[in-house]
């Protein structure tokens, strides 16, 4: 994996980074002249943890935010970020028999990806896998929406998703794809052990090759009149069903 500095913007994202991963926060920028109590708390907390804090202009924050609403604060984050495809095998091996992977096939809305990553971090996933093509990458909007999870999770962008699924199967990882028309219920699956949960993009769902490489296709039962869930909601439901099963005594 490679190291690269990144900027995180927005109150929640910066707070989360300082509280959960302070050693990788290099500096915090706070809007000069602001009396916002939440910004003052961030400044105090950062200084208490030995993080450099600078008061800067709104224009400076606009520059590092890349057009994302920064709410008067940004943090420069110098952590290990760029995971490579070849890291995936080691991550699965390190998780032993409890690897839990989230695979997102073509999620293009950065808010959806950010929300998925936030749920994935809360569920303790081993890694998140996304395709390099036809998918939004990790950008400032994703970081903000994920409340910092995008910079703490191994997120691996792969060239060939079908090939990556085959490699996971060689490591005895079960591949479960979520599809609305599937006959099997999510709640009938055994999600313990080595598992990859695969969800499709907002428009087209799972691509054909992705679907064909799943061991089982399942659906989330919905007794109401709505036919589908937002991908980030579906990811949360699916991940925490896995968490529930894994934590049953």
From Swiss-Prot:
The record's Gene3D superfamilies line, in alphabetical order, gives:
3.30.1330.30, 3.40.1280.10
First-level EC class: transferase
Q: Where in the cell is it found?
A: Cytoplasm
Molecular-function annotations in GO: RNA binding; rRNA (guanosine-2'-O-)-methyltransferase activity
Q: Name one GO cellular component term.
A: cytosol
Q: What chemistry does it catalyse, as a reaction equation?
A: guanosine(2251) in 23S rRNA + S-adenosyl-L-methionine = 2'-O-methylguanosine(2251) in 23S rRNA + S-adenosyl-L-homocysteine + H(+)
Instruction: Name the positions where S-adenosyl-L-methionine binds.
Output: 200, 220, 229
> EC no.?
2.1.1.185
Q: What is its main location?
A: cytoplasm
Q: Which UniProt keywords apply?
A: Cytoplasm, Methyltransferase, rRNA processing, S-adenosyl-L-methionine, Transferase
Q: Which cysteines are joined by disulfide bonds?
A: none
Q: Name one Pfam family in it.
A: SpoU_sub_bind
Q: What does this protein do?
A: Specifically methylates the ribose of guanosine 2251 in 23S rRNA.
Family membership noted in the UniProt record: Belongs to the class IV-like SAM-binding methyltransferase superfamily. RNA methyltransferase TrmH family. RlmB subfamily.
Protein name per the record: 23S rRNA (guanosine-2'-O-)-methyltransferase RlmB
């Amino acid at each position: 994996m490679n190291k690269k500095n990144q900027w995180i913007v927005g109150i929640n994202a910066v707070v989360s980074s300082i509280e959960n991963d302070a050693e990788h926060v290099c500096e915090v920028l706070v809007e000069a002249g602001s009396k916002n109590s939440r910004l003052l708390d961030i400044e105090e907390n950062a200084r208490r943890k030995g993080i450099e804090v600078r008061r800067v202009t709104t224009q400076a924050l606009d520059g590092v935010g890349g057009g994302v609403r920064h709410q008067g604060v940004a943090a420069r984050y110098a952590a290990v970020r760029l995971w490579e495809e070849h890291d995936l095998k080691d991550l699965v091996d390190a998780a032993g028999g409890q690897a839990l992977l989230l695979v997102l096939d073509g999620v293009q809305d950065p808010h959806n990806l950010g929300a998925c990553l936030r749920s994935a971090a809360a569920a303790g996933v081993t890694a998140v896998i996304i395709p390099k093509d036809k998918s939004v990458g990790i950008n400032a909007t994703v970081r903000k929406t994920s409340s910092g999870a995008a910079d703490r999770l191994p997120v691996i962008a792969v060239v060939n998703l079908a090939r990556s699924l085959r490699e996971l199967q060689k490591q005895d990882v079960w591949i479960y794809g979520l599809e609305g028309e599937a006959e099997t219920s999510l709640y009938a699956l055994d999600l313990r052990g080595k598992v990859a949960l695969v969800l499709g993009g907002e428009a087209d769902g799972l691509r054909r090759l992705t679907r064909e490489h799943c061991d089982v296709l399942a659906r989330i039962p919905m007794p109401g009149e709505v036919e589908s869930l937002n991908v980030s909601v579906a990811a949360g439901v699916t991940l925490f069903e896995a968490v529930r099963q894994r934590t049953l005594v």
